[in-house]
């Protein structure tokens, strides 16, 4: 393998490899930004051509990703990227794929289950890892899939949804108001329906007090001690949420307390773990039923549908659902009541017409 700098100041790599027929072939690739990038690309290419699994998991993921990129819809691929890059690569990325055993998968599963994810989300994440190993067994002769031996986690069907009424939320909020980050954070979650990662990624410039809006265009997670900011899983996740006057004034009050904050600075400089701890504290002090942080999002949806009678397409836009079917399937149990209310209103309209 030869790696040289070209006249543009970029790096070229040239090497020989054996293709799937065992024939020696020459390859020349140009214009890498660094020598390291050129070398790594060549090494991956050689591995791909030889179908040799003596590689790190993250290298095989790139092979799998390149193949699936030709076969999956963009939204499906984006969701896959999101899960693998945030939930799988930090744990398995540097491990040799042939050395990952069922016991390793179970340890990873145990770590996931500690984080309070929903049962359906746990199943979804586990399925993504299993799919990569299935691909390796089918096309690259990996002897067996360690995920099959480890068993699955989570559930394919969601459990009964839990959410707070407005009265329950206000009781809870009263018990965490001693900490500004908790008070204003939970207030924003409840009255916007945003996800916890979206809340944590909000910056000062995302809050427009004059227009009374919040801009959602990114998500925050703390992974292996690092702050990780990623775009939403889907394009619909990028949205502008309109705010009630009450919340605008509350957020203005909160911002006024953040000394020296710059436009690009995060509004809530903490983590999901902090809010999870505060939820436990608040529910114990208030006596309201225990729900997950994500269920506050469901509480907002319930408010929109049951109290305000908002149509599914508007709910989908506000929550950032890619498809209206997601909204309808998630909250189908709330819409029958709305259908009955609609019929009652039609009856009133008919009766008023007859009286005239």
Where on the chain are the PLM-derived regions?
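Catalytic-site neighborhood detector that most strongly recognizes the C-terminal catalytic loop/helix
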Residues: 163, 220, 248, 319-344
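Short amphipathic beta-strand and strand-loop transition segments with alternating hydrophobic
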Residues: 1-5
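Basic, Lys/Arg- and aromatic-enriched nucleic-acid-binding interface segment
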Residues: 119, 123, 138, 142-202, ...
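N-terminal DNA-binding module of tyrosine recombinases/phage integrases
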Residues: 6-12, 16-103, 256-257, 263
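N-terminal core-binding DNA-recognition domain of tyrosine site-specific recombinases/integrases
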Residues: 53, 66-144, 158, 271-273, ...
């Amino acid at each position: 393998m030869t790696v040289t700098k070209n006249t543009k100041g970029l790096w070229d790599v040239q090497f020989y490899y054996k293709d799937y027929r065992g024939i020696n072939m020459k390859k020349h690739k140009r214009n890498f930004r660094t020598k390291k990038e050129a070398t790594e690309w060549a090494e991956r290419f050689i591995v791909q051509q030889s179908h040799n699994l003596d590689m790190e998991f993250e290298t095989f993921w790139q092979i799998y990703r390149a193949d699936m990129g030709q076969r999956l819809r963009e939204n499906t691929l984006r969701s896959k990227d999101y899960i693998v890059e945030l939930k799988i690569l930090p744990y398995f990325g540097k491990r040799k794929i042939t050395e990952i055993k069922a016991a390793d998968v179970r340890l990873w599963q145990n770590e996931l289950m500690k984080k309070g994810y929903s049962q359906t989300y746990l199943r979804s994440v586990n399925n993504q890892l299993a799919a990569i190993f299935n691909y390796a067994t089918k096309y690259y002769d990996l002897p067996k899939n360690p995920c099959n031996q480890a068993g699955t986690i989570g559930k394919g069907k969601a459990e009964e949804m839990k959410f707070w009424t407005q009265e329950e939320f206000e009781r809870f909020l009263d018990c965490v108001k001693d900490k500004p980050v908790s008070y204003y954070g939970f207030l924003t979650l409840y009255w916007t329906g945003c996800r916890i990662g979206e809340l944590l990624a909000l910056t000062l410039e995302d809050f427009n007090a004059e227009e009374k809006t919040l801009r959602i265009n990114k998500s925050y997670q703390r992974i292996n001690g690092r702050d990780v900011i990623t775009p939403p899983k889907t394009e619909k996740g990028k949205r502008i949420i309109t705010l009630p006057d009450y919340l605008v004034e509350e957020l203005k009050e909160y911002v006024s307390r953040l000394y020296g904050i710059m436009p690009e600075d995060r509004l809530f400089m903490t983590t999901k773990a902090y809010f999870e701890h505060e939820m436990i504290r608040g529910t114990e002090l208030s006596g309201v039923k225990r729900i997950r942080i994500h269920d506050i999002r469901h509480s907002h949806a319930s408010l929109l549908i049951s109290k305000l009678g908002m149509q599914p397409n508007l709910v989908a836009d506000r929550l950032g659902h890619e498809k209206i079917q997601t909204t309808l399937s998630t909250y189908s149990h709330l819409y029958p009541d709305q259908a009955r209310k609609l019929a009652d209103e039609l009856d009133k309209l008919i009766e008023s017409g007859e009286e005239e």
